[in-house]
């Protein structure tokens, strides 16, 4: 059983003692009896005496997503379904024709390197020796390339939504000097290269043009929205996370390349967050009942697995295990391992990428540096405003928002859940502000990068803490040490042209892009009408 504690989950909510969504069964006289024989249970029909053995009830991570009790604490109950023991068990019983992949996030690589005092290249070699040389995987890849594909999709989605929102305002004859008169703002999507003018052919993209767009790569945040703030679902980005994009790429390619069944390709993902297990279990991320990502492990679980297998990563750097990676099992157009120069936040750089892309595509600004003002509200909430190079008018406003304290404020800000009196006060302030500068909308965001963990993905719940018990290091200082490795200088090998080439090789028909790269969300209804269920808590 993987080691988890309440302290690992800053948003932990104690699960209820009973299911909060019980089946509604009308009381009626039973026509069957139940007979117990040893460890087996049988149902006996009273009229005919016919006997049938009852199966064992089970619950999966996917069932957990349909429950509206807790938010992200569910993995403390069900995480063993994707534990390292289950991974090892699968490897022991795997089919001979099976292809095994490992995908690795750059946050995990940086965390493991910092924990063991190794370089990124050294920890990468250790992981390859363990998974390929010892456990028999065919290939290990990082998610940098799939992340670049996702970022490009997110940026195009934002530009489409921004243009649709602007068109909607114009149809309603809403006067705005920046939108209607600004010479840099295009009057149609056809003026923008790389932005789709017809979103109906890109059904996965946020077609309703609801701003702000809220990033969706954090499954803890997605669970929170689906279970407690479903009114925000239209704002969520429809683009898959890098984990799920990578899983889809690998399985699609292997099935086609080797003419094999989808369930003969097995994919393990190494991620900084336990919630990624829940994401991998969503029905939306499976094809014909086969998941794109079969299992997810975090650095905390990897360390436990190393101990179980009696593997010392530091010793491996001195006495390496020979191994041979199967190059035939990797798409030739997908960069296997890239020590990229990481740009933007240590949570994937969504906001920074979208801001730069939108500045160029929407306003013709190549270098946003001189025209972006930053307002650091606190360590985990930072606002960015792009202004016109000549007039200093506000063009777009974005933010990074980490941790549930800031998320709750964001929710109130986006859909105004405050009291009427407070709303009136804010309205008066906004009216006065607009009277002084009619082009400013300080309370409006156009795009927000949202992560449930304080500090973002680099500080995910599955990341390893500072290793020494002899010296006390604050969580913030440790996170900065890991970030230093994450941002270690590298070479940008995945650019826009490389992303376009990968998409062409993977998705032959551009109209199918939404099927491969986009997803959907659903409101999870709560049952708060039963006072007995509400009172019966641990």
Swiss-Prot record:
Residues reported in the UniProt entry to bind [4Fe-4S] cluster 2:
218, 273, 453, 457
Q: Which GO terms describe its cellular component?
A: cytosol; cytosolic [4Fe-4S] assembly targeting complex; nucleus
**Protein localization:** Cytoplasm; Nucleus
The family database entries (Pfam families) matched by this protein are listed as:
Fe_hyd_lg_C (PF02906)
GO MF terms on file? 4 iron, 4 sulfur cluster binding; ferredoxin hydrogenase activity; iron-sulfur cluster binding; metal ion binding
**Keywords, alphabetical:** 4Fe-4S, Cytoplasm, Iron, Iron-sulfur, Metal-binding, Nucleus
Q: Looking at the record's lineage, which domain of life comes first?
A: Eukaryota
- Binding site residues for [4Fe-4S] cluster 1: 19, 64, 67, 70
Q: What is its main location?
A: cytoplasm
GO BP, sorted A to Z: iron-sulfur cluster assembly
Please verify whether the record's keywords include Isomerase: no
In terms of PANTHER family, this protein maps to: NITRATE, FORMATE, IRON DEHYDROGENASE (PTHR11615)
Q: Which family does it belong to?
A: Belongs to the NARF family.
Give a short account of what the protein does.
Answer: Component of the cytosolic Fe/S protein assembly machinery. Required for maturation of extramitochondrial Fe/S proteins. May play a role in the transfer of pre-assembled Fe/S clusters to target apoproteins.
**Name of the protein:** Cytosolic Fe-S cluster assembly factor NAR1 homolog
Q: From which organism does this entry originate? A: Schizosaccharomyces pombe (strain 972 / ATCC 24843) (Fission yeast)
């Amino acid at each position: 059983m993987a080691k988890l504690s309440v302290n690992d989950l800053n948003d932990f909510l104690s699960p209820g003692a009973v299911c909060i969504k019980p089946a509604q069964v009308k009381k009626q006289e039973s026509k069957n009896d139940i007979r117990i024989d040893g460890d087996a249970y049988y149902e006996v029909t009273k009229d005919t005496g016919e006997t049938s053995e009852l199966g064992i009830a089970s619950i999966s991570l996917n069932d957990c997503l349909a429950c509206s009790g807790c938010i992200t604490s569910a993995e403390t109950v069900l995480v063993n379904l994707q534990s390292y023991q289950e991974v090892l068990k699968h490897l022991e019983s795997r089919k001979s024709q099976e292809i095994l992949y490992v995908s690795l996030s750059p946050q995990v690589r940086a965390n493991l390197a910092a924990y063991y005092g190794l370089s990124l290249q050294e920890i990468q070699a250790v992981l390859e020796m363990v998974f390929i040389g010892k456990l028999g995987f065919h290939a290990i890849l990082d998610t940098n390339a799939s992340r670049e594909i996702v970022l490009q999709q997110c940026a195009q989605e934002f530009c489409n939504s921004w243009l649709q929102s602007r068109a909607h305002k114009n149809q309603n004859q809403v006067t705005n000097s920046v939108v209607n008169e600004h010479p840099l703002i295009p009057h149609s999507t056809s003026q923008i290269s790389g932005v789709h003018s017809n979103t109906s052919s890109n059904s996965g993209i946020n077609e309703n043009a609801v701003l702000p767009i809220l990033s969706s790569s954090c499954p803890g945040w997605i669970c929170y929205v689906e279970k407690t703030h479903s009114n925000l679902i239209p704002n969520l980005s429809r683009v898959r996370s890098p984990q799920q994009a990578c899983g889809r790429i690998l399985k699609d390619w292997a099935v086609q390349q080797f003419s094999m069944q989808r369930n003969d390709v097995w994919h393990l993902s190494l991620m900084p967050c336990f919630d990624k297990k829940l994401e991998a279990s969503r029905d939306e991320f499976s094809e014909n009942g086969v998941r794109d990502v079969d299992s997810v492990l975090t650095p905390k679980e990897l360390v436990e697995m190393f101990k179980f297998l009696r593997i010392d990563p530091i010793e491996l750097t001195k006495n390496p295990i020979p191994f041979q990676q199967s190059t035939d099992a990797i798409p030739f157009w997908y960069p296997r391992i890239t020590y990229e120069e990481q740009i933007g936040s240590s949570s994937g750089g969504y906001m920074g990428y979208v801001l730069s892309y939108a500045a160029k595509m929407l306003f013709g600004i190549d270098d946003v540096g001189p025209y972006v003002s930053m307002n650091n509200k606190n360590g985990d909430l930072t606002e960015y405003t792009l202004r016109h190079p000549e007039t200093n008018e506000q063009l777009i406003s974005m933010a990074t928002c980490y941790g549930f304290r800031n998320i709750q404020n964001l929710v109130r800000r986006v859909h105004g859940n405050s009291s009427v009196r407070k709303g009136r006060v804010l309205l008066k302030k906004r009216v006065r502000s607009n009277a002084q500068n009619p082009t400013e909308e300080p309370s409006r965001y156009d795009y927000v990068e949202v992560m449930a963990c304080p500090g973002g993905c680099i500080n995910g719940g599955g990341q390893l803490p500072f290793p020494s018990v002899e010296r006390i290091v604050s969580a913030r200082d440790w996170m900065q040490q890991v970030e230093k490795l994450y941002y270690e200088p590298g070479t940008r090998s995945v650019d826009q042209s490389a992303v376009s080439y990968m998409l062409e090789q993977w998705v032959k028909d551009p109209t199918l892009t939404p099927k491969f790269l986009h997803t959907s969300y659903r409101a999870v209804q709560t049952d708060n009408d039963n006072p007995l269920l509400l009172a019966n808590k641990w």
